[in-house]
Amino acid sequence: MLLQRFFTRALHSTRQLYAGSGGSGGLEKSALAALRKKTGYTFANCKKALEKHNNDVGLAEKWLHEQAQTLGWSKATKVADRATAHGLIGVLIRGNRGAMVELNCETDFVARNDTFKRFVDHVACMCLQYTDLTDFDGDLWKLGFDADALRNLRTEEGRTLGDHLALLIGAIGENATIRRALCFKANNDLKLVGYAHPAPTNVGTTEGITQVGKYGAIVAYRSTHPLLDFEFHKSICQQIVGMKPTKIGEYDKDKPAENKDDETCLIHQEYLLDADKTVGEALQEHNCEIVDYHRFECGEHTERSLEAIIRSQHQSSN
């Protein structure tokens, strides 16, 4: 569970927790051990839950989760006004589906915390699963989520991501927000590739591998090359993360910038892995066409909505 310790101190030692009273009210060691293993909560709280529910592990577990949720929402309310200037981008690709999410927190220390990273992965997986509910015509489908829409997404057990966010806040002890997400789904011969930077940490799940970092990119491409060159396609994501192109560009409409350092058109930019060629030349060598892309930078100021950005990129790529 996201909130594995919703009380920070155990009031008794492990020996005291296991010691029964000798009477009918004593705790069974097996029940205490099972509840502790299943929930991850402290021995003190597992003991308290079992005592309240006459050693019924099921009822004790339910009570623990309810207490954790209540404390999480209480903490979330108290810290809601605190700024969340740090955080992570999560990028998850599975087959023809992709999701990129941004979550924010108060400190870089928490952003490096495994609990926070797992929650980034959880949100990315929820967004990826949402794409399964959508059928569409055409080659590429994209959908942006703002903070409100993300918080209202429901998980399989019926809770919202907002509920899970409250649990996270209770666990990490500081404010956190789910800022935005973007889903991709490709049809026909289109493929997706994603990348997070710097030195991405991978969080494994049943949905795939979520990369987390301060920057992220997802690229939709079409390739007629007989062999799929993952490293090359990843390098295009790295190019987009590092050089921040504003559009893909068209050879017959977009002229290269006079100063190559000012180039914002992807196909005319200097290729990061080979300064002697442009990205466009590298793409031609690999029989690859970039159809669409999107870039996230953690904490970046965005005046336009995701929907507006999607529309403008679609128009510029046509």
Curated annotation (Swiss-Prot):
Entry's family note: Belongs to the EF-Ts family.
Transit peptide location on this chain: 1-18
CDD domains: UBA_EF-Ts
GO biological process: mitochondrial translational elongation; regulation of mitochondrial translation
One cellular component (GO) term of this entry: mitochondrion
Name recorded for this polypeptide: Elongation factor Ts, mitochondrial
Function: Associates with the EF-Tu.GDP complex and induces the exchange of GDP to GTP. It remains bound to the aminoacyl-tRNA.EF-Tu.GTP complex up to the GTP hydrolysis stage on the ribosome.
Molecular functions per Gene Ontology: translation elongation factor activity
Pfam families: EF-Ts_N, EF_TS
Protein biosynthesis found in the keyword field: yes
Main localization (coarse): mitochondrion
Alphabetized UniProt keyword annotations: Elongation factor, Mitochondrion, Protein biosynthesis, Transit peptide
Subcellular location: Mitochondrion
Gene this protein is translated from: mEFTs
InterPro entries reported in the protein's UniProt record: EF-Ts_dimer_sf, Transl_elong_EFTs/EF1B, Transl_elong_EFTs/EF1B_dimer, Transl_elong_Ts_CS, UBA-like_sf
